A protein has these predicted regions:
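Alpha-helical scaffold segments that flank or form the walls of functional sites
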Residues: 99-123, 205, 214, 276-282
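A charged helix-plus-loop insertion that forms the helical arch/lid used to bind
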Residues: 88-103, 146-148
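Catalytic domains of carbohydrate-active enzymes, especially glycoside hydrolases
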Residues: 32-45, 113-125
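Short, conserved acidic/polar surface loops in the N-terminal third of protein domains
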Residues: 82-87, 93, 137-139
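N-terminal basic, low-complexity leaders that serve as flexible interaction/assembly modules and, when applicable
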Residues: 1-39
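Second-shell residues forming the walls of enzyme active-site clefts
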Residues: 8, 20, 26-29, 47-66, ...
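Short, conserved phosphate-binding/catalytic loop or strand-edge motifs used
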Residues: 131-141
Length: 291
């Protein structure tokens, strides 16, 4: 299939936008915006999935309506966060895999199996692995999604996941930079504002990012948490300091940087949709995600 290259400013900006939708088939407004080049990517959820045949037909239809091409993405971490379940290959969550014998090899192999299935279904990008360090057992948004509380272990296992997925042709997105592990506040419902020191973030929380970047991570997802030591005004997702100075500058990352979903209340309680999208772009974000 031959794709066009975006030429107008509107289509160039549109290629930064990722959206979700309700239902097992794409609504007309999504297909229209794809044809116009005003959407660059789609994020799939369980609400879009019935079985493998239906999902493959859905991704085919999205591509058929996208002259500029469309990137299909999903959260398929395994365990508690998996959009593909019955009829698909299921994986244990990160913490369970981290408890297994020969865990590094197992995680790389399991990621490769999942990657092969995702590619066959027409999916390109998996928002995984979670590389947050587990600090609180009652962290409502983390739970067993993390590889654990030891930064060296998390680094080794997260890098294995990146290698496995990307060897199978699926882009990964270690998340949530620089960390969503320091709070018991769920960013789906509120904006955490924390006093964690920059030195701690550098020495501990950014260790898995150094490892996954070295492993070739195609993208990094930025958290909605506000760290006062980094930027007292903006949450990380909307912060040029975090994206440009810390991720791009200090870590030397030159891959794709994506927001977490801008419809989470950590953002919507403080910013409108258009405002948050513009601020994210100005911060240096490449992919702007709405669900």
């Amino acid at each position: 299939m031959t794709f066009l290259s975006p030429t107008s400013l509107e289509t160039r900006v549109g290629q930064m936008v990722f959206v979700g939708f309700e239902g097992l088939t794409a609504p007309d407004y999504v297909l229209e915006r794809l044809r116009e080049g005003r959407i660059g990517g789609i994020i799939l959820f369980a609400r879009n999935v019935a079985d493998p045949a239906q999902l493959a037909a859905l991704t085919d239809s999205l591509q058929a309506n996208a002259p500029y091409g469309v990137i299909i993405s999903i959260d398929q971490e395994g365990g508690t966060v998996a959009r593909l379940r019955e009829g698909f290959t299921e994986s244990p969550g990160a913490m369970a895999l981290a408890s297994a014998r020969d865990r590094e090899r197992l995680i790389e192999a399991m990621s490769g199996v999942l990657a092969a299935e995702l590619r066959a279904l027409g999916i390109h990008w998996n928002y995984a692995p979670v590389v947050d360090i587990s600090y609180y057992a009652d962290n409502p948004s983390m739970g067993t999604r993390t590889f654990g509380s030891d930064p060296e272990t998390v680094s080794v296992l997260a890098a294995a996941a990146v290698r496995g997925f990307q060897a199978g042709g699926i882009a990964t997105s270690p998340k949530h930079f620089p960390s969503a592990g320091h709070t018991s506040i769920d960013t789906h419902v509120a904006l955490p504002a924390l006093d964690t020191s920059l030195e701690h973030l550098r020495q501990i929380d950014m260790m898995p990012y150094r490892a996954t970047i070295a492993a070739g991570a195609a993208s990094v997802m930025v958290t909605h948490v506000l760290y006062r030591a980094l930027d007292a005004e903006y949450p990380c997702t909307l912060s040029p300091i975090v994206v440009h100075q810390l991720l791009r500058g200090e870590l030397g990352y030159d891959g794709v940087v994506t927001t977490d979903c801008l419809e989470m209340q950590a953002i919507t309680n403080h910013y409108g949709a258009a405002e948050s999208a513009v601020l994210a772009a100005l911060a240096g974000i490449d992919a702007i995600l709405f669900s």
